[in-house]
Amino acid sequence: MSRRRAAVRSHAEKAARKGAAAALAILAEEAKRRTPVETGRLRDSCQVRTEGQSGSVIFTAAYAAARHERREGGKFLENACWDPDVRAAMGEEVRRAFAAEMR
């Protein structure tokens, strides 16, 4: 692999990591906003975990999965994932990361 190609690849990988982290942060904030609040523990248990160019948003409270599956006020993470505005904002963060890194 040429030196130039290796440099481009390195920058692209760095941009992907930054973009993924920024996009997941947006998703986490929207999911927390949609989370039903009684004590705040569920909302406070939201975490973003990244590994390389991918990651996840999770709620670690013991009752998070059960609460997510309820009809009333449920699906707070899933619905945030499918929201077109959230998806657009996440995509924009990835685009910005690539634009900044690939100058």
Language-model regions: role of each:
Residues M1-R103:
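Short, Lys/Arg-rich flexible segments
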